[in-house]
Amino acid sequence: MNAKAFLAIFMIALLITDRAEAGWWNAFKSIGKKLLKSKLAKDITKMAKQRAKEYVVKKLNGPPEEEVAAIDALMNSLDY
């Protein structure tokens, strides 16, 4: 059986069963919420936001002047 199909069947079975049998789902959600509010998760989120900002600035501003000079020199050498 395909792993994705098995996971889908498992999740549907959890939704159908009694609340008492699926009680671990609430524990899983509460642990997830605690992890998302942890210092490590906040640090990772902060780093990801910083990297995204740096990427956007890099793409919007274009290459640094040294790279432009190197590309110009390369293009001039190809012209003969």
UniProtKB/Swiss-Prot annotation:
Cystine residue pairs: none
Signal peptide positions on this chain: 1-22
Top-level taxonomic group: Eukaryota
Subcellular localization, as worded in the UniProt entry: Secreted
GO cellular component, one term: extracellular region
Homology family: Belongs to the non-disulfide-bridged peptide (NDBP) superfamily. Long chain multifunctional peptide (group 2) family.
Protein name: Venom protein HGE029
Species annotation: Hoffmannihadrurus gertschi
